[in-house]
């Protein structure tokens, strides 16, 4: 039964509303693919929190426009309050990827043109908190890749931001992406721990930090060099160096998705023949020259004694629930291991 799998879920975030909706006059009806009460009834926990996520990858314009002035921040915040009042949601999750740059448009709008956003990010949060009050939840999705963390935050802005945020969901996945040129685990233990420690060392309280899990698989085309070693070897060029356009040499699919036809043969080799080091699960297909990276239930479970427990983190989250359907094998693992963690 699906209800058994979700019995331990405490927070559900509905993604996404576009950030630009909150810049001007509020719409007569907020664009949500479902309604909060319908979602609430699907989950057993009486005190389930349902949040609305704003933004997501590639959606930065509304955040930038709001952050640029005090008037813009105030309007943005008041519209978020209106949306929460109208939908009955328990809070808002801000997915600005990312203040300061390194987003989808990083080749079109340089990081230097967006550097001003770093300093005003806490000001935007302050305005939203003032508008929605202390009883509504406000969280943020934040990057896990070191180069993105460095662009988005300073220690001072993180410390100030945490005055207003209830918690941060640290995206400890996609830690290898098409901008890289050597293979690595996309959600490994070591690179996840580096991300977590970066936030903890820069002012994020452990109890407000959540570790992210990926319910999907990633693949990357490589050079012949990977025949010598699959990790740390060169990939082919995966992104246009001038435009940032995806060259189709990497990708992802979830456990719920149909495996793309052109990848099916390779992935069917990868699953039973996967390698595991102390950091994570991977496979290199010598015939197709494809590097695969994904979390198995076993590798997910290892992140608790390696990261969650010693760092005393507040929780864990996954992107995203539907991506683990219909078997929910990875969700079951998170539930079981987190229950054990809570007893320690």
Regions found by a protein language model. Name each.
Residues 1-84, 331-336, 343:
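Glycan-recognition patch characteristic of GH18 chitinases/ENGases
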Residues 9-10, 46-50, 88-92, 134-136, ...:
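Short, well-ordered coil/turn segments that N-cap beta-strands
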């Amino acid at each position: 039964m699906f209800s058994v799998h979700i019995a331990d879920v405490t927070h559900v975030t509905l993604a996404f509303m576009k950030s630009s909706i909150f810049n001007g006059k509020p719409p007569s009806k907020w664009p949500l693919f479902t309604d909060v009460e319908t979602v609430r009834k699907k989950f057993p926990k009486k005190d389930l929190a349902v949040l609305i996520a704003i933004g997501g990858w590639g959606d930065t314009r509304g955040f930038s426009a709001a952050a640029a002035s005090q008037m813009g921040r105030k309007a943005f915040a008041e519209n978020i309050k209106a949306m929460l009042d109208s939908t009955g949601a328990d809070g808002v999750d801000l997915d600005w990827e990312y203040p300061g740059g390194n987003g989808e448009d990083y080749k079109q709008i340089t990081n230097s043109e967006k550097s001003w956003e770093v300093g005003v990010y806490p000001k935007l949060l302050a305005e939203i908190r003032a508008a929605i009050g202390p009883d509504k939840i406000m969280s943020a999705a934040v990057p896990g890749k070191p180069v993105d963390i460095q662009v988005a935050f300073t220690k001072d802005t993180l410390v100030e931001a945490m005055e207003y945020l209830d918690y941060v969901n640290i995206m400890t996945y996609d830690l290898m992406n098409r901008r890289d040129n050597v293979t690595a685990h996309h959600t490994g233990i070591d690179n996840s721990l580096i991300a977590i420690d970066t936030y903890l060392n820069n002012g994020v309280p452990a109890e407000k930090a959540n570790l992210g899990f990926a319910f999907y698989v990633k693949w990357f085309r490589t050079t012949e060099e990977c025949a010598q070693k699959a990790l740390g070897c060169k990939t082919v060029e995966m992104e246009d160096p001038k435009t940032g356009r995806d060259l189709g040499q990497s990708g992802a699919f979830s456990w719920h998705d149909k495996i793309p036809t052109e990848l099916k043969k390779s992935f069917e080799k990868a699953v039973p023949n996967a390698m595991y080091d102390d950091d994570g699960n991977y496979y290199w297909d010598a015939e197709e020259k494809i590097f695969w990276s994904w979390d198995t239930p076993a590798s997910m479970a290892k992140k608790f004694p390696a990261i969650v427990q010693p760092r005393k983190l507040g929780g864990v989250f996954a992107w995203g629930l539907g991506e683990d359907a219909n078997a929910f094998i990875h969700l079951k693992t998170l539930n079981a291991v987190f229950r054990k963690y809570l007893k320690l």
